[in-house]
């Protein structure tokens, strides 16, 4: 029976399905509320444009009908565990996060665990990245003692004498004692730790005065761990809820999932997972990723997911706390998770291409496609980044034999008076090549500009002026801001998507030079935040950013009239404050 006939005969019932390849290996396991409807999408011509390798590999399929959602979830989990299909999400079995728990016992105690404990009285976590979880545990044991020993010793234990045990070792402890201590621990993890820090600072000072320097250092480590718990976030969050945010990014043939854990308004943990993407059903992959995450980790109050993921495709137990973005704060969460996924995937692409082992083949193909005149041993790539035409930074990255030479990477400050892409690129390249000529440095065999014809013409003008015979090509992106086209030395546009190794290599160049340039303007921007305007008491970052977005430079702000400034700020008091301070 042909594959199409098998699909046509599938029942309109819930169940699990398995795809097999020519070697009879299971390559994908999925579940569906309607088997026929779901499996048919893989063989639909419109959908099949995206499915590529996965669908091409399918030679056979099998299915199981189930009675309910819970049964299909369990069956899918067991089938994935049994066959390890290469196109499924396969998180490591040890994909767990650090927690501190309080045991659910008559005389509870603290424990550090690497897995959410459903039986525990309290689970605190995942704990912040960079924090020393065991140091936090030690702090809790010392400041809010619970049971520390095995109990029922008929005599006080050593920890009781050190004020680190409730005394369950030799007496009945009033339950109200534990209730009070646990309330203090709750406050502690909500960030109310000023009193705790004061106590620790006093203990550290006392240990230091008594020349107990090792003890003082241990206490200092505890204070550092507390700072991680209450570290100020880049996003101001007002919530008492535990929120997890999941998003994804697809780039070339890879997909990256990122999950951000917010606990009581603090970002405490981030995790990522990258695997091959060959057109698998996105909602299924997303659902499978979430299932595996929450098999061993605590459910949040809210799980935020991107709008394009269908909630109906999620399992019932995930549906109960899953949500799309409902307000501006949710939008910030979703965008932040998206940016993390993009960054993680970009780093993965760069890392993969640094060690690809196909350098000679890639360079030969690049020479051929770009019509370059000689072997491309040394390549220099140029890009420019800015924000609101301010903090303009040019960047040059250098590759020799297709390997990055980081100590030759350079950044160039570009004055805002250069207002066009052409003039900025021309300024940077002129500065670059004049120095190389003067100091007799090695010149590139190929110049690649991140951009189109405008940037290419700027580069050619500089090279002609300096009488340098160096080939110039450009890299441009598609409507989704992904690397797509190469503009060769004759200014012909070539789609490079199908030249996979070359495409991956050029994508990694474009990502790296873009990130390197952005790191320059970010530094300038953060330095600028300490400028004259922000030093004015009562003027914040938002006002500062509005002014620079509109006026571009501090000189333009100083020369603006009251009406011009107030039109941007829309606050007469602040406008007067700025004018009076800048005119001092």
From Swiss-Prot:
Domain named UVR: residues: 194-229
Compartments, record wording: Cytoplasm
Keywords on record: Cytoplasm, DNA damage, DNA excision, DNA repair, Excision nuclease, SOS response
The family this protein is said to belong to: Belongs to the UvrC family.
Complexes and interactors: Interacts with UvrB in an incision complex.
Function in brief: The UvrABC repair system catalyzes the recognition and processing of DNA lesions. UvrC both incises the 5' and 3' sides of the lesion. The N-terminal half is responsible for the 3' incision and the C-terminal half is responsible for the 5' incision.
Name by which UniProt lists this protein: UvrABC system protein C
Native organism: Mycoplasma mycoides subsp. mycoides SC (strain CCUG 32753 / NCTC 10114 / PG1)
